[in-house]
């Protein structure tokens, strides 16, 4: 099975050490850990600083990586950091997902783990918006009838900046995501949509 993980710096594996930052090794990035522990082909499509796309390039994204069984998207943190509310971020996410829904794959929406006070997160209001984002995404997933992963209860450890995962955070995220994938696998198996030119199966 091929899973495309579309996200921001926490999907990419950004490590905020040094002046310009760095990247965790493959053994400490949740995407690579997911691949190692499941045996599935996991595509890391994370990018530092990425917000929810507002330009219609979703089809190009699909053709670049086709065929894809599951499109896992986890975005919204950078939107909040740039001043958007949780509701505004959810509206952007809905517009983005509506570009993808007619085209082939199963979408899995994940809420980013909540931020905490830190070097990048100066206010409690920002933390509250990051918690509220999961509530907005849950409602959106119900509206679009797609699986949803709520990471709020995973207690992901974050670095000093209040945004990025620590190594332990990446490992915990991978473990929890594997459990979540297993719990929704029946639904994925029975709702899997894939490009018509490619026959495939789920987990």
Predicted stretch roles:
Residues 1-47, 51, 59-67, 171-172:
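Serine-esterase "nucleophile elbow" of acetyl-processing enzymes
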